[in-house]
């Protein structure tokens, strides 16, 4: 028997094979990819994940992410699609929007939300596109001082971020002695620069932001205030840190960090009455909704990732539970325990501690840097990232390590466990200093890595790695059973 396909006849066995291919599980369909995923799953299970920007999504979130929603294309917004067959997609997106407002206790008459951004960076760029004309002026925390690449980073010789390419950016800074944001200098510079938008957001800053002060500065300059709460969105939802919504015009976030969802983004914007005309008494309404929605689609994106929106909706439901609130309090408690333990071991913590989920360890007093420490810790199954510290002269040799507690807290680690984690880190940095003394302080990072991989230090690396992996394996890894 044969079947006609595009004018040709295909053997029935081929179609049978085709149908079998569509029904095969990954482990049978693509062994190479399956094995890579299994290796990564094992790395996460036996290692200590200390990236401040990472977390372990729940099984429910990952199931939604891997659902049939991946198949559906749906350009547009609920009730205004360019494709048919979207009644359930509309239902899903509307539910996600409703939950987003509920999770942050927002009045739907005063706030709206776009849940279509593919991630945090597109969400930020959509806001800039909507509210700041090309070559308009933006102020954000400088990347070496704890800001984010999308907040306008540029060097003296090159515009690095698209934000700095298409808009004019002036960074604000932290005080190099204290590590705290210098709000006085920000206020003074804003009066000279006259930004259209000020960004209240960080990627490596361990203290709460003064949103009231930032709003005052924004108002003095006729600027919008946008919070990028990507790192702290879960903490905000749980009421563990101050909320940006009281003072900001717009709030953006990713959904996979402390919120513990899948990788996506959201943009919250004010609605309703903005002010009242003093002469006419007429209400002036915000127009942010139409500007932001049109910037996301059709301005910068095509069809939304409906499977990701489903994952975000699930995460938002979880974020409204008592269990989630307890988890977020534990994230902060664990971070303080880690900070205190490292301080007792002789390490300098930038700003002297933390109000949130991360700390920045300044290694200059130890005589080493973040790049070398990062490589040694990675070899010992401790995952974290190098980061610039206030006062660093070069981003190519950052002095610090950024450490975060959300992921390991999701695995069930408590304060006493993070004290052990601190000692593992300490042993790794001591090993870093041994290798560095052997190679010399002027050795390149490449030369350092070669010495690290040599026979002389592999015994010490293996011994520490085995202890780390034995400890990490005591705690369950959230997610799908097979991965």
UniProtKB/Swiss-Prot annotation:
It catalyses: (6R)-5,10-methylene-5,6,7,8-tetrahydrofolate + glycine + H2O = (6S)-5,6,7,8-tetrahydrofolate + L-serine. GO terms for molecular function: glycine hydroxymethyltransferase activity; pyridoxal phosphate binding. It is found in: Cytoplasm. Its EC number is 2.1.2.1. GO terms for biological process: glycine biosynthetic process from serine; glycine metabolic process; L-serine metabolic process; protein homotetramerization; tetrahydrofolate interconversion; tetrahydrofolate metabolic process. Keywords: Cytoplasm, One-carbon metabolism, Pyridoxal phosphate, Transferase. Pathway: One-carbon metabolism; tetrahydrofolate interconversion. Coiled coil: none annotated. SUPFAM superfamilies: PLP-dependent transferases (SSF53383). Signal peptide: none annotated. It is an enzyme of class 2 (transferase). The modification N6-(pyridoxal phosphate)lysine is found at residue 257. InterPro entries: PyrdxlP-dep_Trfase, PyrdxlP-dep_Trfase_major, PyrdxlP-dep_Trfase_small, Ser_HO-MeTrfase, Ser_HO-MeTrfase-like, Ser_HO-MeTrfase_PLP_BS, SHMT-like_dom. Its cofactor is pyridoxal 5'-phosphate. It comes from the Eukaryota. Belongs to the SHMT family. Homotetramer. Identified in complex with ABRAXAS2 and the other subunits of the BRISC complex, at least composed of ABRAXAS2, BRCC3/BRCC36, BABAM2 and BABAM1/NBA1. Interconversion of serine and glycine. In eukaryotes there are two forms of the enzymes: a cytosolic one and a mitochondrial one. This is Serine hydroxymethyltransferase, cytosolic. It comes from Pongo abelii. The lineage of its organism: Eukaryota, Metazoa, Chordata, Craniata, Vertebrata. The gene is SHMT1.
């Amino acid at each position: 028997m044969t079947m006609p396909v595009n004018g040709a006849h295909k053997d029935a066995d081929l179609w049978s094979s085709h149908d079998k291919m569509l029904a095969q599980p990954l482990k049978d369909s693509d062994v190479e990819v399956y094995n890579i995923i299994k290796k990564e799953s094992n790395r996460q299970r036996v290692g200590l994940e200390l990236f401040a920007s990472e977390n372990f999504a729940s099984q429910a979130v990952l199931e939604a992410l891997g659902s049939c929603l991946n198949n559906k294309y749906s350009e547009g917004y609920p009730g205004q699609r360019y494709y048919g067959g979207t009644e359930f997609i509309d239902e899903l997106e509307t539910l996600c929007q409703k939950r987003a407002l509920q999770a942050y206790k927002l009045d739907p008459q005063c706030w709206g939300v776009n849940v279509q951004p593919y991630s945090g960076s597109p969400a930020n760029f959509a806001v800039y596109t909507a509210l700041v004309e090309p070559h308009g002026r933006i102020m954000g925390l400088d990347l070496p001082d704890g800001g984010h690449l999308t907040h306008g980073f540029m060097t003296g010789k090159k515009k690095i971020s698209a934000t700095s390419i298409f808009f004019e950016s002036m960074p604000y800074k932290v005080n190099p002695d204290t590590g705290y944001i210098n709000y006085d200098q920000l206020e003074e510079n804003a009066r000279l620069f006259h930004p259209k938008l000020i960004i209240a957001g960080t990627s490596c800053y361990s203290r709460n932001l003064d949103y009231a002060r930032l709003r005052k500065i924004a108002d003095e300059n006729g600027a919008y205030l946008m919070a990028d709460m990507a790192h702290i969105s879960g903490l905000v939802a749980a009421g563990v840190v101050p909320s940006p919504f009281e003072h900001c015009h717009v709030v953006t976030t990713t959904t996979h960090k402390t919120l513990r969802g899948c990788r996506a983004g959201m943009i919250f914007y004010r609605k309703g009455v903005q002010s009242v005309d003093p002469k006419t008494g007429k209400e002036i309404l915000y127009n942010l909704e139409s500007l932001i929605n049109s910037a996301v689609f059709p301005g910068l994106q095509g069809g939304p990732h409906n499977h990701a929106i489903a994952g975000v909706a699930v995460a938002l439901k979880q974020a409204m539970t008592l269990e989630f609130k307890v988890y977020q309090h534990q994230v902060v408690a664990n971070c303080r325990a880690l900070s205190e333990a490292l301080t007792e071991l002789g390490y300098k913590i930038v700003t002297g501690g933390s109000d949130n989920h991360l700390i920045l360890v300044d290694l200059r007093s130890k005589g080493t840097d973040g790049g070398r420490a990062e490589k040694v810790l990675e070899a010992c199954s401790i995952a974290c990232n190098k980061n610039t510290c206030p006062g660093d002269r070069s981003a190519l040799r950052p002095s610090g390590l950024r450490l975060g507690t959300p992921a390991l807290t999701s695995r069930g680690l408590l304060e006493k466990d993070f004290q052990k984690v601190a000692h593992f880190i300490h042993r790794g940095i001591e090993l870093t200093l041994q290798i560095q003394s052997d190679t010399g302080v002027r050795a390149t990072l490449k030369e350092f890595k070669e010495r690290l991989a040599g026979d002389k230090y592999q015994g010490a690396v293996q011994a520490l790695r085995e202890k780390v992996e034995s400890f990490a394996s005591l705690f369950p890894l959230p997610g799908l059973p097979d991965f």
